[in-house]
């Protein structure tokens, strides 16, 4: 549901920010 959507968006956001801060 909505909670799961928010959770996956949070995971995606963290990965995205992580790539900006610490690119591979």
UniProtKB/Swiss-Prot annotation:
Compartments reported by the entry: Secreted
Any one GO biological process: defense response to bacterium
Primary residence: secreted
Tissue: Expressed by the skin glands.
Keyword annotations from UniProtKB, A to Z: Antibiotic, Antimicrobial, Secreted
GO cellular component: extracellular region
Function description: Has antibacterial activity.
Family: Belongs to the gastrin/cholecystokinin family. Magainin subfamily.
Protein's recorded name: Xenoposin-precursor fragment B1
Lineage: Eukaryota, Metazoa, Chordata, Craniata, Vertebrata
